Amino acid sequence: MALNWSFRVIFVSAMWCALLKFATLEEREDDNDYGGGCPFVVLGNGTHAKPAGCSHLCNGAPETLDNIECYNVTEEVAKRMTPDIPYTCWLGWCSKGECKRDNRTEVCYRGSERE
């Protein structure tokens, strides 16, 4: 009789431990937070994508890019572009959050939302 009772205690203890183990394996919601930033609007040219401008507001705070090629187009204008229609865009270089335009242009387009 004592052996039967011991088996039950061990079995219940093992089940309780397993339940606690699986209960702690749940993924927390904040595990996939990669910094909380906001993505920049980008335009493509068939082979590369570049940001439209070099600064924007993210949750009320400014975010800027530096030392990267950009299109000298505001995010507002880029968002109004018709997807998959080619446009002529001025190229520039991000410097302290401003896309400094140079004397080059290239075809650019806004991708479709499904991409």
Curated annotation (Swiss-Prot):
Key word Glycoprotein present: yes
Carbohydrate-modified residues: 45, 72, 103
Disulfide bonds: 38-58, 54-94, 70-99, 89-108
Nucleotidyltransferase as UniProt keyword: no
Signal peptide: 1-25
Single GO term (MF): C-C chemokine binding
GO CC term (a single one): extracellular region
Keywords: Disulfide bond, Glycoprotein, Secreted, Signal
Localization annotation: Secreted
Task of the protein: Salivary chemokine-binding protein which binds to host chemokines CCL3 and CCL4.
Name by which UniProt lists this protein: Evasin P1181
Naturally occurring in which organism (per UniProt): Amblyomma maculatum
